[in-house]
Amino acid sequence: MDRSGSAAPRDRVMKRRRVYAALAAALALCALSAHGLKLFEPLPLDAAASTSRLVLDRDGHLLRAFTTPDGRWRLDAEPDEVSPTYLAMLLAFEDRRFWKHPGVDPLALGRAVLQAIRHGRPISGGSTLTMQVARLLRGSPTHSITAKFQQVADAARLEAALSKREILKLYLKLAPYGGNLEGVRAASLAYFGKEPHRLSIAEAALLVAIPQSPETRRLDRSEDGPAYAALLEARNRVIKRAVAAHVITEADAKIAMAQAAPHGRHEFPALAPHLCERLIAAIPDGQAIKTTIDGKLQQAAEQIMRRNAQSFGDKISAAALIVNHRTGEVLAHVGSAGYFDDTRLGAIDMTAAIRSPGSALKPFIYGLAFEDGLAHPETSIEDRPVRFDTYAPVNFDNSFHGTVTVRTALQLSLNVPAVKVLNEVSPVKLAARFRDAGMTFEVPRNLTVALGGAGLSLENLTALYVALARGGTAIPLRYRKESETAAGASEAATLLQPAAAWYVTDILRGAPVPASASPGAVAFKTGTSYGFRDAWAAGYDGEHTIAVWVGRPDASSMPGLVGLRAAAPVMFELFAATGARRAPFAAAPANVIGSRKTADLPPPLRIFREQKREPAGVPGQEAPLHIAFPPANSEIELVSVEGDTGKLPVALKAEGGTLPLTWLADGVPLAASPHRRETFLTPSGPGFVQITVIDAEGRSDRTQIRLR
């Protein structure tokens, strides 16, 4: 009988056994010999440095993740952030003696070598988690002899350089899960739509099993059939090993093995997507950016904006900002009705888009008039046809209301009174006040600003209304928690004096509300741009300021869609999302004129009078009213009286005009004799003061001085 045919296979088996026996000896020597470590190249730890950049909410929860430069989802995960059941199952299945061995488990390695010698081929790898991390860092093959030498040497090097916890963290970050998924957190978010600390037993077992064969076991490809059956079999082996290691009970295992494995992949979280993109672009360094965003409120706001935009019609988008105006922190940022909705151009961030604000700037025009002593909320003003050279404003409904109060004019958003007041206040002064208060936009120096003839963004408008809500003090909007210098004195700037801001708030609290809202709880103003291209609403209570824009990003018309009917109901719905109770408004400053009747006002404030600017020195005419002292823009040093904590009064003197006179400092009447042309200002401290004098005919003069 010819035995040559059977001798050859036996020889090949014996040769393999000798190779594996030699390998076992070499591996042991390499693991224990420092001299052996010098034979290998340094371990490329930099390979683990590149991770997905994250944007987090104020509590550290994920808003959005971005792939690494090589297109991978690779997210850091601390052991404390992962399900304890998953960690226990991982160690029970992959490396029972992880916390004890020096990087190489001699028992597991010896068993693997003996099995390979006995069967003539590798049966189990014998790799520890440390060796697997070394392989992932090196990118070397799994089962080659050279790779095993390298893994042993690298494992010893890792154990010398890192703690066990750091090595475990590397595995949690680098374990392959198929496609471009790396690490347990990326896999948990993609396959189960949840953070890894919330994994069930069945889910944890899947995440232990998949890295052994990531491409064949990936959940977005393992549909019904042999691949799916093999996936369940691998998962169940992990579960059975966990039972044997007393990680879970038999009852828990039975329930877990009866569960199906999910198919497909979830989208990664993408809350506040426009803001996240902006921050990532603006901040090139840092793995995680922590924002001021309230994750739950952000999610609710996005749903509200999406639902309402869909109800308004095709191609209509919507944007909103919710701000805690006490700190300037932005709690929700909704840039569009849906970032991925191409039909609504959802990728465009409409919080930053420059649009016409409609009537939304009127409160600030009236606020300056209150400061200058030109008007009071109960001042009567005429709503009748008027012309300013070639400009003849008309009201939104093309009608006129005759004599109304300033309160009514602002609450009804009448156009003619607003333009009249701006003509007296001066568009130049309005633009300068915006600039001096730190606003980042510019408005034209003409009367059309009152009716929307300017360009600003939703962020700009929100910053203005934040200042109103704060009693006239402007602060920057804040998006990052790292910038903890909240609303400091160095950041604050005056937009309106407190009394003027309170008058505006008191008026806006009485503005007509949508049918679904309760009056008085929110001070707000709406706006509609020319041609029905933009609908706005901005409002505030004692804690939150919310601004809403509704429109088409391409600036096409939306006939019939106006601020009160489109944007205001959405704004009130967002207020409801912040909590059931509205925070109360601040109390009125002590120096406001609280009268609700026009007849009770000082005579110069009862009727709004447009200035009659007459040249001085014309025979037969009274000299025009003007402030003779102090001169405009003068600086006056405050002088203290010895033994007294107060400051000496500052003399004021007027010339011309018709008695009686009314004096105001920063819009607040002074206690002065109306039939004298001289009076005194008692300074409250250093700073700029606006001095106004008004005569019996309603003519006025103003000057600004600095006390130091």
Question: Residue spans of the language-model regions?
Answer:
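Non-catalytic, structured segments within soluble enzyme domains
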Residues: A31-A34, R121-Q299, V394, R435-D436, ...
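N-terminal type II signal-anchor transmembrane helix
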Residues: D11-R58, R97, I117
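Active-site SXXK
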Residues: A88-L91, D95, R237, A242, ...
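Short, well-structured active-site flanking segments
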Residues: W99-L109, E182-R185, E250-D252, R344-A347, ...
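A penicillin-recognizing enzyme superfamily signal
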Residues: T291-S311, I322, H333, D341-M350, ...
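Active-site loop and adjoining helix of the penicillin-binding protein/serine DD-peptidase-beta-lactamase fold
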Residues: A155, P211-A234, D285-L297, I304-R307, ...
